[in-house]
Each structure stands twice: as C-alpha cells, then as structure tokens.
C-alpha cells in the first residue's frame, strides 16, 4: 500500500542517457532523500484519509532548530520523532495505506520499484510581467510604418453597451510561478545507491526546486 504514497524530491537538472536501443534520451534528474511520515489522518478523526510527508530534514543543533520554527511546528514535529522538516506535503490515500505506515517511518525511492510511469508536480519558472504575445501567443498588430500597436492585444470590449471589459479575458499579467503537473512521464532509471530518479522529458521548476513524484493513475507497472 506504500505505492499510493508520493515522494518529495528536488530537481537537479537535465542530462542525456542512451536507452537499450541506442537512442539518446533527454532526462530530468530528481534527487530524493529519505521522506518522513509526519502525520496520519483518518476518516474517523479528520473526515478523510491522508498521510503528511516531510522532507529535507534540518541537520542543526536543537537550539538552532527552535529559533527557525514556530512552537506549533516544533510540537507537530515531536509527534513524529522530533525531526524538523523544511517541506511538508499531504497526500490523500486509502484507509489501508494509512494503516500500513506509522508516525516517523522513513521511505524513499524503493516504493517506486517496478513503476514505469509517474506524475510530477511542481511550481513552474517565474517569468515576471509579460505581454499577451509572449504569454498567450497573440499575433500582434501590423508591423508597418506608422502603426502604433505592434504588440497590443487588440479590441477586448465594446462602447456604451456593455461599457466595460468582461472579466476573464487574456491580458498582460504575471507569467509563471504556477502549480503544474506533468502526467505519465516514463521512468528511465531509479538509482537507489545515489538516491536519484531519471524520468524522460522535462519537469516544471528550476534547478533545486521542490517537486512531488507519485505513481501515475491508470498505468500498470
């Protein structure tokens, strides 16, 4: 039942590897240290079944940890063995999966042994405030001499009726920093000794960003 759990990892970048047919495959590298079960939620006490997972355990003296975290979080960490984690994520699972783990249990890439496809969730790269041509792929205005709206969006409303622009239209705004899930990525290799996973293709985020890896739904293997 641990196969229902997700893993918190870190994007390390991209590299190329050769597959068994000799083809060059672009892969994303994800490093996964030990994940800790920080909290268990059941339908009887919380209304749903879930497991809270912690990662990136702080290696520092106790006095330093007390300064970095609030008293509420310190009390929360003591229930799971006293290990303070920088990252906490909650995964909704079945009742059997909750019963298969205990507070303070550690697990890693071994739960994905034999898994061929995974879903990866992360925060996309932030690109700042962008116009409609970059963000939405608008064509823009005429490029001829005398034109004054080369990169404008064009008309987005009418005159006196309704006398306003309807909400939800595509306009210049902040681009990136969105929660993105890339589904059904092929697992190229899982190296338990080096604690890294190679998946085919690109994943959201910058180098060093936190990603959540889970088994793809509806995919055998």
Curated annotation (Swiss-Prot):
GO cellular component, one term: cytosolic large ribosomal subunit
Gene Ontology MF terms: rRNA binding; structural constituent of ribosome
Functional summary from the UniProt entry: One of the primary rRNA binding proteins, it binds directly near the 3'-end of the 23S rRNA, where it nucleates assembly of the 50S subunit.
A biological-process GO annotation: translation
SS bond list: none
Protein name stated in the entry: Large ribosomal subunit protein uL3
Keywords (A to Z) from UniProt: Ribonucleoprotein, Ribosomal protein, RNA-binding, rRNA-binding
Gene name, Swiss-Prot/TrEMBL: rplC
Taxonomy, superkingdom: Bacteria
Phylogenetic classification of the source organism: Bacteria, Pseudomonadati, Chlamydiota, Chlamydiia, Chlamydiales
Family that this chain belongs to: Belongs to the universal ribosomal protein uL3 family.
Oligomer and partners: Part of the 50S ribosomal subunit. Forms a cluster with proteins L14 and L19.
UniProt cross-references to Pfam families, sorted A to Z: Ribosomal_L3 (PF00297)
Presence of keyword Ribonucleoprotein: yes
């Amino acid at each position: 039942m641990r196969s229902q759990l997700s893993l918190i990892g870190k994007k390390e970048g991209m590299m190329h590897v050769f597959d068994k047919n000799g083809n060059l495959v672009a892969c994303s590298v994800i490093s996964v240290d030990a994940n800790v079960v920080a909290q268990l939620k059941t339908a009887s006490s919380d209304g749903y079944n879930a497991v809270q997972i912690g990662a990136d355990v702080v290696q520092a003296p106790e006095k330093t940890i007390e300064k970095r975290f609030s008293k509420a979080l310190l009390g929360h960490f003591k229930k799971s063995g006293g290990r303070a984690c920088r990252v906490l994520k909650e995964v909704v699972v079945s009742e059997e999966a909750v019963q298969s783990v205990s507070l303070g249990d550690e697990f890693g890439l071994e739960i994905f042994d034999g898994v061929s496809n995974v879903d990866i969730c992360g925060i996309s790269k932030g690109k700042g405030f962008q116009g409609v041509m970059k963000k939405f792929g608008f064509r823009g205005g005429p490029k001829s001499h005398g034109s004054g709206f080369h990169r404008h969006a064009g008309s987005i409303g009418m005159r006196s009726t309704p006398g306003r622009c309807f909400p939800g239209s595509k306009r210049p705004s902040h681009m990136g920093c969105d929660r993105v899930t890339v589904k059904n990525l092929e697992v190229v290799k899982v190296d338990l000794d080096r604690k890294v996973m190679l998946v085919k293709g690109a994943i959201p985020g910058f180098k060093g960003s936190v990603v959540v890896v889970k088994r793809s739904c509806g995919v055998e293997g």
